[in-house]
Amino acid sequence: MEKIKSILTEEIGKKGYISISRFMEISLTYPEEGYYINQNPLGKSGDFITAPDITQIFGEVIGAWAIDIINKINAKSPFQIIDLGGGRGTLLKDIKRVRSDNNISFGFLEINKNLITAQKQIFPEAKHYKNISDIPDLPTIFIGNEFLDAFPIRQYIKINKAWKEIFVTTDNDRFNYCYEDIEDKILFEEHKKNFPNEADFFEINIMIKKIINDISIFLKRNNGICLFIDYGYSKGYGNTLQALKNHEYVDPLSFPGSSDLTSHINFSQIINETKYLGMNFFGPITQRNFLINLGALERLEILKKSTNSEKIKNDLEDGLNRVIENSQMGELFKVCAISPKNKLIPEGFD
């Protein structure tokens, strides 16, 4: 943390402030020191737990969804499933359990060395890639569960009817916010039209455009689909920057390099980028409805019938409820998919 703090302070000293996106970039991905490079963010010892580690049903029904996609495209040709991020590897492992054959290969797009180690332990045969350009040219299913929320954002606020950008500065050896003239006016104007006129605060995820573009080019060349599952909103605006440390919310500026910085996804930004690139877009739909549409409740009953243990039955119910109940992850998390312009219609988005 002290090394990251020193790097941030030095960069701020050059002109008095840095963008929130730069603060996030250094805090999360600075070589050897950034949170996503050096920390182990998952599980009880980390800062958050994702749906695949809460219930096996999550991965199993998504696995069945993926197999349906493969069958619709061409079940006999070689295919790959790539987990964007991937956590510990639980999701891909659950998907493989649904169907495993020589035609299907598995891989992770991951930069965190601790998670790469964990993924190799649970799934040694899976490949690892650091960039989409490294992934082999094959029909592909990309799955990004809580992947987009970690990319840097820019924030803007309207003060006295004038738009300002929010930056990070130093104040008595602490990081604090300040408001300055907008740094990239072209970027601001490009995205401002996507927000209501009455908005007085909005955010731009600056990496979504590149991610959607890179995945779209890959899928147009090779065929397949990309599934995104993340917390966010279809319409709306406001400050969603947050930090998690030891499973608790903390001030986003207080623990650079040792807390997980994320923001909510504006799914309208994905829709606009997808349409611009001439791709099909499905969703967004709540995680609750998506999983139920895929048969999560039916899978729960099958698993309950396979055991006589009341504790296991209760644990299965509690795990699924956590990811589908509206008061927990079911409503906040949304699901969408993008694919090339073809006749492929993925299940779950009815």
Regions found by a protein language model. Name each.
Residues 28-33, 183, 230-234:
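Short glycine-enriched loops at secondary-structure junctions
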Residues 189-350:
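Long, Lys/Arg- and hydrophobic-enriched amphipathic alpha-helices
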Residues 27, 142, 270:
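A residue-level signal for conserved active-site and pocket-lining positions in enzyme catalytic cores
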Residues 137-160, 202-206, 210, 218-219, ...:
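A short SAM/SAH-binding and catalytic strip from SAM-dependent methyltransferases
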Residues 84, 111, 147-150, 231:
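Generic detector of well-ordered alpha-helical packing
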Residues 141-192, 241-252:
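A mobile, often basic/glycine-rich helix-loop segment
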Residues 1-84, 88-131, 135-139, 156, ...:
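Rossmann-like AdoMet
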Residues 58, 142, 230:
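Conserved RecA-like P-loop NTPase ATPase core
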